[in-house]
Amino acid sequence: MIPVVIEQTSRGERSYDIYSRLLKDRIIMLTGPVEDNMANSVIAQLLFLDAQDNTKDIYLYVNTPGGSVSAGLAIVDTMNFIKADVQTIVMGMAASMGTVIASSGAKGKRFMLPNAEYMIHQPMGGTGGGTQQTDMAIAAEHLLKTRHRLEKILAQNAGKTIKQIHKDAERDYWMSAEETLAYGFIDEIMENNELA
């Protein structure tokens, strides 16, 4: 169930679902697994807010375990495509594809709440049952290219070498807010709507 907010206007009461009300304040919620429908919703909101006023920042709140690489990269590409700066605020967790999205916020405007977590790892893939050997080889090559592309983005976002990201992402690499700040994926830790 989505909560409804009622506001008083000059024309009387107006009700909004909570997400529409947040959108009025240029806030987008990216929560749950990254998949095509969620990505399309986030992208549409980014494009709408940029068209409305590209001089004002957009606030993207992130709490995701990750998910689809293609859906996540579509969000990242849109964040880079629009003129408005996108501030990212990690709450809960940004894991896997979520780290790529959250770390792609505007430089100097990437934030994290004090008890949130970050996790990087190598991308996962599969070919399903009954796959021919040549298709498996193609899938493996694509997975390696995808890994390199993601490592390149993460390295740029954190100011690290691709070699360092590759090493750290070999297995699940969890970081606290303080560790994420030291690593370079965020710019500040936020407490009580203020910077720590």
UniProtKB/Swiss-Prot annotation:
Listed EC numbers: 3.4.21.92
Lineage: Bacteria, Bacillati, Bacillota, Bacilli, Lactobacillales
Name of the protein: ATP-dependent Clp protease proteolytic subunit
Cytoplasm found in the keyword field: yes
Family: Belongs to the peptidase S14 family.
Pfam family, one: CLP_protease
Subcellular location as annotated: Cytoplasm
Predominant subcellular localization, coarse grouping: cytoplasm
One GO CC annotation: endopeptidase Clp complex
Taxonomic source organism: Streptococcus equi subsp. equi (strain 4047)
Free-text function comment from the UniProt entry: Cleaves peptides in various proteins in a process that requires ATP hydrolysis. Has a chymotrypsin-like activity. Plays a major role in the degradation of misfolded proteins.
Molecular function terms from GO: ATP-dependent peptidase activity; ATPase binding; serine-type endopeptidase activity
